[in-house]
Amino acid sequence: MKKVMTKEGVELRVEDSIIYTTDSKAFWRSGNMLIGNGKAMSYTCRSMDEAVDIVAALYGGKA
C-alpha cells in the first residue's frame, strides 16, 4: 500500500488498482481508463503512478 499526501491535505491511499482518499472518494484504473466521481477521467492512463498524479492534481498536486 502506497500513501501520498496532497497540497490540500487530502491523503491518497493506493491499493492494487484503486485509489482511496481521506475525503471518502475512490478512483480506480481499469485497463487504460481512470474512473472516479461517476465518470471516466482519462482514457489514456498508462500506469498507477500516472493515475496517482492525475488524482493528486485534483487536490492541488503532491505535497
Go through the PLM ranges and name each one:
Residues E8, Y20-S24, R46, A56:
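Serine/threonine-rich, low-complexity intrinsically disordered segments
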Residues V14-A40:
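Short aromatic-glycine-(Arg/Gly/Cys) micro-motifs in beta-strand/loop hairpins
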Residues E11-L12, A26, M48-V52:
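Short amphipathic alpha-helical segments that mediate assembly, nucleic-acid/protein binding
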